[in-house]
Swiss-Prot record:
Major subcellular location class: cytoplasm
GO CC terms in record: cytosol
Pfam family, one: Transcrip_reg
Organism whose genome encodes this protein: Campylobacter jejuni subsp. jejuni serotype O:2 (strain ATCC 700819 / NCTC 11168)
GO biological process: regulation of DNA-templated transcription
Family, as annotated: Belongs to the TACO1 family.
Listed name of the protein: Probable transcriptional regulatory protein Cj1172c
Disulfide links within the chain: none
Keyword annotations from UniProtKB, A to Z: Cytoplasm, DNA-binding, Transcription, Transcription regulation
Localization in the cell: Cytoplasm
The keyword Cytoplasm appears for this protein: yes
InterPro entries: Integrase-like_N (IPR017856), TACO1_YebC-like_2nd/3rd_dom (IPR048300), TACO1_YebC_N (IPR049083), Transcrip_reg_TACO1-like (IPR002876), Transcrip_reg_TACO1-like_dom3 (IPR026564), YebC-like (IPR029072)
Length: 235
């Protein structure tokens, strides 16, 4: 989704009712990363980033350690990554990424949210050509020379570097996630959030009235416990 709309969404997510759902989602992301790539953060860039994101959101260390421990436990839940595609009101395109130990429950919930809020679920793959998957790092603002930083990170897979009033955003091809993550850490940059995101190839502008309709669906999706991230083609 476009940066301006992304910040609008971020300000909504900062409300306490949203924050109260955040820690379980962060814990789930840590657990899945640890189970997929091992529990040693030094050897697992996705786990390092999941931990850094949790810390940036003030998640207590005990919660982080517990999530990692659950991943290595014999009875740890089999949490799967699940991907859905759909349309919201006014034709806005939506990609929903979930983590769930009960896919049947999750698909029923996601379909219900779309149908009750003016949208529809599409067949997976329908939106593949409308979005590009990128490794995206949201960082604290950088006080140094941005051109020099850009040159330093190009060999690690940097494709785009953008700084605004809120943060520094660095992105590259999704396959460069690990290498970019290591290079960013080596530069001492302060990470707020990182992951693989779906970036719209042709963002679309909507009126305020249309955005209000679309956000009803987005709010409901983000409130669902199994939903980790929601991406749109909104400019």
């Amino acid at each position: 989704m476009g940066r301006a709309f992304e910040y609008r969404r971020a300000s909504k997510e900062a409300r306490w009712d949203k924050m109260s759902k955040l820690f379980p989602k962060l814990a789930k992301a840590i657990q899945v990363a640890a189970k997929e790539g091992g529990t040693d953060p030094d050897m697992n860039p996705k786990l390092r980033s999941a931990i850094a994101t949790a810390k940036a959101n003030n998640m207590p260390k005990d919660n982080i350690d517990a999530a990692i421990k659950r991943a290595s436990g014999k009875d740890s839940a089999d949490i799967k990554n699940i991907h859905y595609e759909g349309k919201a009101a006014h034709g806005a395109l939506v990609i929903v990424e979930c983590m769930s130990d009960n896919p049947t429950r999750t698909v029923a919930n996601v379909k219900a949210i779309f149908s009750k809020n003016g949208g529809e679920v599409l067949q997976n793959g329908s939106l593949g050509f409308m979005f590009t998957r990128k490794a995206v790092f949201h960082l604290e603002k950088f006080a140094g020379d941005l051109e020099e930083l850009e040159l330093d990170l190009i060999d690690a897979g940097l494709e785009e570097l953008e700084q605004n009033e809120e943060e520094l955003v660095i992105s590259g091809d999704y396959t460069a996630f690990g290498e970019l993550s290591s290079a960013i850490e080596a530069k001492g940059l302060v990470l707020k959030k990182a992951g693989l995101e779906y970036i719209p190839n042709n963002p679309v502008s909507f009126s305020e009235e249309q955005l209000s309709d679309i956000e009803k669906l987005l709010d409901k999706l983000e409130d669902d416990d199994d939903v980790q991230a929601v991406y749109t083609n909104i400019d």
